């Protein structure tokens, strides 16, 4: 793994670049987390909620129909869509709310794009009876209305953010501001592998259950490892969790799929690894989509969860080291894959995951029937059906 040093760096990426007012809170979080990782009661409690609340381990499914129709390699799915709340996000929120409880916090906040992290945060807020506030861009509130309703039903206050592009970046900025103002009683449950140290490490550790389970399950069924592992990448939490299980297996190729949007022009995609440059965003040093003056360029994706102009610092490290290959799929390709997976396999995937499916289709056709591709099915697509229907004008063929 791209093991971070004491300052929270992965190679040249990472670190802690935050306002002075957050320094003590970040140090407290780091110190508490280090202690809890060694605490038997914490580990037992986390395992209890993973098994009895989230429903882990999530299944490994052989996608027989996709394998037959696409041709080439066999397709396997790690079913994070079957977790409680419908995505991988609950893996992280359940862990972080236990940290918040250990620190004596009474209020939790979060940012969300597609709304799945917001729902997962609202869920643990309800279960642990903590005041919960979720920041969400107005554009994302429009295209992910179902999840906004779910959050409110769970008791969370949903705050629309209209600044900037009114998407994930802006929601994250507002959540950071809230945390700075209410740091004494509030824990910020960062939803992706982004932010100042120790957030990228904490999120990766809680999501690593995906890859650890996947490796064990796949080997048990096939008596070998997959040839390729594919996951979508926005900030990158589902991908970093999936890759964790295979990062030391050099023969397993790892692919991160970003959002190619509708063109390669600035402002029309979220392909940070391909088009980004080293910079600073939300408290970390990473690859960022920016102009020649260092200003953040607006990102775009048909998928709200991938609509982010940065990427987790560990992904930036894996790109630079060459261990993971990062590619991108455009909006239309993702929409096509969304409908195709529905029709062929009877699974409605999240639009985020649809990017991974589209790339897997192309890759599978370059491989033999004896080879295997494992896809992280990061979430279900109930939240996306209205937006897909709108974009395709009700035509699904």
From Swiss-Prot:
Catalytic reactions on record: (1S,2R)-1-C-(indol-3-yl)glycerol 3-phosphate + L-serine = D-glyceraldehyde 3-phosphate + L-tryptophan + H2O
GO biological process, any: L-tryptophan biosynthetic process
Modified residues (N6-(pyridoxal phosphate)lysine): 89
PROSITE patterns attached to this UniProt entry: TRP_SYNTHASE_BETA
Transmembrane segments: none
Pfam family, one: PALP
InterPro entries: Trp_synth_b_CS (IPR006653), Trp_synth_beta (IPR006654), Trp_synth_beta/beta-like (IPR023026), TrpB-like_PALP (IPR001926), TrpB-like_PALP_sf (IPR036052)
Annotated pathway: Amino-acid biosynthesis; L-tryptophan biosynthesis; L-tryptophan from chorismate: step 5/5
Sample GO molecular function, one term: tryptophan synthase activity
Keywords in alphabetical order: Amino-acid biosynthesis, Aromatic amino acid biosynthesis, Lyase, Pyridoxal phosphate, Tryptophan biosynthesis
Highest taxon in the source lineage: Bacteria
One cellular-component annotation, GO: cytoplasm
Cofactor requirements of the protein: pyridoxal 5'-phosphate
EC number: 4.2.1.20
Role according to the record: The beta subunit is responsible for the synthesis of L-tryptophan from indole and L-serine.
Cited PANTHER family: TRYPTOPHAN SYNTHASE, TRYPTOPHAN SYNTHASE-RELATED
UniProt family annotation: Belongs to the TrpB family.
Subunit details: Tetramer of two alpha and two beta chains.
NCBIfam families: trpB
Entry protein name: Tryptophan synthase beta chain
């Amino acid at each position: 793994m791209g093991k971070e040093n004491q300052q929270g760096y992965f190679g040249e990426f990472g670190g802690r670049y935050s306002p002075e007012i957050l320094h003590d809170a970040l140090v407290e979080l780091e110190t508490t987390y280090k202690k809890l990782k060694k605490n038997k009661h914490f580990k037992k409690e986390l395992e209890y909620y993973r098994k009895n609340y989230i429903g882990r381990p999530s299944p490994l499914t052989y996608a027989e129909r996709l394998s037959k129709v696409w041709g080439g390699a066999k397709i396997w799915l790690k079913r994070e869509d079957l977790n409680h709340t419908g995505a991988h996000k609950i893996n992280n929120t359940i862990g972080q709310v236990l940290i918040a409880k250990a620190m004596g916090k009474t209020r939790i906040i979060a940012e969300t794009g597609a709304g799945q992290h917001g729902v997962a945060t609202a869920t643990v807020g309800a279960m642990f009876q903590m005041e919960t506030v979720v920041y969400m861009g107005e554009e994302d509130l429009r295209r992910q209305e179902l999840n906004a309703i779910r959050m409110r039903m769970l008791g969370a206050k949903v705050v629309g953010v209209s600044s900037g592009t009114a998407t994930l970046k802006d929601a994250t900025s507002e959540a950071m501001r809230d945390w700075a103002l209410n740091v004494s009683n509030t824990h910020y449950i960062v939803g992706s592998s982004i932010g100042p140290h120790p957030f990228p490490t904490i999120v990766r550790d809680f999501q690593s259950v995906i890859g650890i389970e996947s490796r064990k399950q796949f080997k048990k069924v096939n008596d070998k490892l997959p040839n390729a592992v594919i996951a979508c990448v926005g900030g990158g939490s589902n991908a970093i969790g999936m890759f964790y299980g295979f990062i030391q297996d050099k023969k397993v190729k790892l692919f991160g799929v970003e959002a190619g949007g509708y063109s390669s022009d600035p402002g029309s995609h979220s392909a940070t690894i391909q088009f980004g440059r080293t910079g600073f965003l939300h408290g970390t040093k990473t690859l960022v989509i920016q102009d020649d003056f260092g200003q953040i360029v607006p990102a775009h994706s048909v998928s709200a969860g991938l609509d982010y102009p940065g990427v987790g610092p560990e992904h930036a490290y894996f790109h630079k080291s060459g261990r993971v290959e990062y590619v991108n799929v455009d909006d239309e390709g993702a929409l096509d894959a969304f409908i195709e997976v529905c029709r062929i396999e009877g699974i409605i995937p999240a639009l985020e995951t649809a990017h991974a499916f589209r790339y897997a289709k192309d890759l599978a056709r370059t491989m033999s029937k004896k080879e295997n591709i494992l896809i992280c099915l990061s979430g279900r697509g109930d939240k996306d059906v209205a937006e897909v229907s709108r974009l395709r004008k009700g035509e699904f063929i």
